[in-house]
């Protein structure tokens, strides 16, 4: 359950631990969210401005409160009870907010993203100013934003019968190409798209792989104003409801296959073998095993491959450590990122060995099943077994891998630019994302382009067919998307029975980093930098760097299980998943049962095909909108100047993040400070020579004395211990050594 209670236990020590729980004890079930946020801000201010000792604990303390604050803002609930602060995430699509209306929920979700948007806009100030005030021989981006009065007059003339609807609004698709310039303003089309993307409330996330960006323009406007923007990018690998819909999920596969007869079941398993052989053929195994092993793998062969993968990963980690700790300026770098060629080779050796072992294991299991004399009696039990589930999953993943990056795209950006949103411009953008022009542009751009990851695994260029047959998307809000609701393109406009429908497939869980602010990200990086200096954008590391940072930092900063760590990456921003099939045989094509897609129209004549979609939008959606009288006033009232991004940035509120630094001055005697605080501040703080020595080296030079024993015995008897003396006499050394096996964690230390 997403909304189960999870203990929030920071790994803090000494006074920092005591202070955290003192602050947390102020939080009850009835404490308002705003009050909780103020408590977090108060503690962050204390550790930044007032606390001047123990830099390591200061960093962790700030990071913990930043993370706690972001979780609260993302509608996590907190309550201190029996010495522990418990947190739970309300399911916005469930009972926790069943009385909340769609507008209220959308307003709440927008508020979560407002801070990160401000941080983002401040970072783009120079770009925004350049686009709005471009200088000589160029016109401002404002020229591409329609005036409300002008658009209102145009569509009103249609309503009164003065002009045809085809004359009033004339949409067309413009593919953004590198270095192309807009003929009306002289601005780069890529920068025009980028500017309008910054008007979105959601953060801009760049993803590696294939990307196609579009401007939707209005030729009826003197400057061909931008009606909307779209971006199609590589699909997310794991979306369960989508994979169920297509047939790539082993659970759905098994539920379907157990309903067929024995002969049909055997054919289905033979198809799985085809998937596996295709996957194996995509791996360069020349340095891993022989062709005979691939043909007839044994359990021993598979284990040797797994051992090889483990060794390769150890080598990769060592190469990465060497790069971080040593002088590697002269090391040849990989094209994948800021890593060495050696680290890259180790990465792909691991990937090849892992994938080959998994595929060969599945191949052996399924082939043994097919060849079994008692197949009819055992195949259903095979489907229910752990071995069978694993083998089926591996085969389906192999087939999905073949198409996920070449036959499918995700509509990650889709929306209208005001004032065209008032005439359902968003629906136009969504329809055009499935148009013949998009299918044509995709094939033209990627038909001869090798797949980077597949090519590296194969050891040679791999060019897969660039036949786009599926476009997916997710709504911004879980409460529904009017943009995709009831949205379909009837086949009748192309003289076919095949309708293109944006079909609701299911829901995503709220999972990711959208609720984590930039300040929190930087604070987590600062607090855990020793462990995370190898987090990068290189293929092979797993999820996005920000997601890995969040997960790893939670494990280091909080006393939590792996399941709890993952749950803290969740937020209440669930989304609806939609999908649109672009070919009559999309499923059979993606499942390898047919070799070519059967599109709904002749893609060679993509221009007229796309125009039919535009005509359909005008007659189905725009025309009905013209009969809604309030629209004219809303379009007329559109504030073009207020829409300019520069007018949405508070110039007096520049965002900044200050790293915590060790106090370098000698603290002065303060008569108001007593006890531990006086002792702690008497000297220069906690940073000593031993703070900067690795634990292994410290252990090597440590000599255990009676002092170690005396400290432990005193702590176990419930005493607080103060180590005092002269700087450099080994106090920090002793404390760091005792921390390794320290059991009395409630004991308080005042270093130096």
Describe each model-derived feature in a short phrase.
Residues 697-699, 724, 746:
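AAA+ P-loop NTPase catalytic core and its hallmark functional loops
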Residues 2-662:
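Extended, composition-driven regions rather than compact fold-specific motifs
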Residues 212, 719, 747:
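Short coil/turn segments at beta-strand junctions that form active-site/ligand-binding loops
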């Amino acid at each position: 359950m997403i909304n189960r209670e999870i203990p929030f236990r920071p790994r803090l020590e000494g006074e920092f631990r005591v202070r955290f729980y003192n602050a947390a004890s102020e939080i009850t079930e009835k404490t308002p969210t705003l009050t909780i946020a103020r408590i977090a801000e108060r503690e962050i201010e204390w550790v930044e401005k007032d606390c001047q000792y123990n830099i390591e604990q200061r960093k962790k303390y700030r990071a913990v409160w930043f993370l706690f604050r972001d979780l609260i803002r993302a509608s996590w609930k907190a309550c201190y009870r029996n010495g522990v602060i418990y947190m739970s995430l309300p399911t916005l699509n469930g009972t926790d907010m069943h009385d909340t209306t769609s507008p209220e929920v959308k307003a709440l979700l927008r508020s979560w993203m407002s801070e990160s948007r401000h941080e983002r806009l401040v970072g783009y100030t120079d770009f925004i100013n350049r686009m709005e005030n471009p200088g000589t021989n160029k016109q401002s981006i404002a020229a591409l934003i329609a005036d409300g009065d002008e658009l209102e007059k145009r569509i009103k003339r249609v309503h009164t019968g003065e002009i045809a609807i085809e004359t009033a609004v004339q949409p067309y698709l413009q593919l953004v190409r590198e270095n192309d310039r807009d003929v009306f303003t002289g601005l780069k089309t890529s920068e025009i798209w980028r500017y309008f993307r910054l008007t979105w409330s959601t953060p801009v996330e760049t993803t590696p792989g294939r990307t196609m960006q579009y401007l939707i323009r209005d030729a009826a406007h003197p400057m061909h104003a931008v009606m909307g923007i779209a971006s199609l990018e590589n699909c997310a690998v794991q979306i369960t409801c989508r994979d169920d819909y297509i047939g790539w999920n082993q659970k759905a596969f098994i539920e379907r296959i157990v309903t067929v007869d024995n002969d049909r079941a055997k054919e289905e398993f033979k198809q799985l073998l085809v998937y596996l052989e295709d996957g194996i053929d995509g791996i360069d195994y020349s340095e891993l095993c022989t062709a005979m092993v691939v043909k007839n793998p044994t359990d021993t062969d598979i284990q040797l491959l797994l051992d090889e993968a483990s060794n390769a990963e150890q080598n990769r980690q060592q190469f990465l450590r060497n790069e971080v700790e040593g002088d590697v300026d002269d090391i040849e770098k990989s094209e994948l990122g800021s890593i060495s060629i050696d680290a890259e080779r180790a990465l792909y050796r691991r990937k090849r060995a892992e994938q080959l072992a998994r595929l060969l294991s599945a191949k052996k299991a399924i082939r043994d099943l097919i060849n079994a004399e008692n197949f009819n009696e055992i195949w259903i039990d095979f489907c229910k077994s752990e071995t069978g589930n694993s083998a089926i999953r591996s085969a389906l993943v192999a087939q999905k891998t073949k198409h996920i990056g070449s036959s499918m795209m995700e509509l990650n950006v889709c929306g209208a630019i005001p004032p065209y949103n008032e005439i359902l411009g968003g629906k136009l953008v969504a329809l055009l994302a499935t148009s013949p022009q998009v299918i044509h542009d995709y094939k033209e751009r990627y038909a001869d382009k090798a797949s980077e990851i597949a090519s590296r695994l194969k050891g040679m260029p791999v060019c897969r067919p660039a036949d786009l047959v599926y476009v997916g998307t997710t709504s911004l809000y879980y409460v529904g998307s009017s943009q995709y609701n009831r949205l379909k393109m009837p086949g009748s406009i192309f003289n076919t029975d095949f309708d293109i429908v944006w079909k609701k497939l299911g829901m995503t869980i709220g999972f990711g980093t959208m609720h984590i602010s930039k300040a929190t990200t930087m604070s987590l990086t600062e607090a855990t930098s020793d462990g995370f200096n190898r987090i990068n954008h290189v293929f092979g590391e797993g999820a996005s760097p920000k997601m890995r940072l969040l997960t790893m930092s939670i494990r280091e900063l909080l006393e939590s299980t792996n399941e709890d760590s993952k749950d803290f990456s969740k937020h209440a921003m669930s989304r609806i998943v939609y999908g649109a099939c672009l070919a009559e045989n999309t499923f059979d094509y993606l499942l390898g049962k047919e070799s070519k897609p059967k599109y709904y129209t002749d893609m060679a004549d993509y221009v007229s095909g796309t125009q039919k979609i535009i005509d359909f939008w005008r007659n189905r959606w725009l025309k009905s909108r013209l009969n809604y009288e309030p629209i004219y006033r809303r379009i007329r009232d559109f504030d073009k100047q207020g829409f300019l991004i520069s007018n949405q940035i508070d110039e007096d509120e520049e965002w900044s993040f200050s790293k915590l630094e060790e106090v370098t001055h000698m603290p002065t005697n303060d008569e108001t400070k007593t006890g531990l605080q006086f002792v702690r501040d008497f000297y220069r703080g906690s940073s000593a020579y031993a703070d900067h020595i690795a634990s292994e080296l410290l252990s090597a030079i440590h000599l255990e004395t009676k002092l170690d024993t005396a400290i432990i015995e005193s702590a176990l008897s419930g005493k607080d211990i103060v180590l005092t003396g002269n700087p450099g006499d080994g106090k920090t050394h002793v404390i760091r050594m005792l921390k390794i096996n320290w059991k009395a964690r409630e004991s308080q230390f005042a270093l130096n």
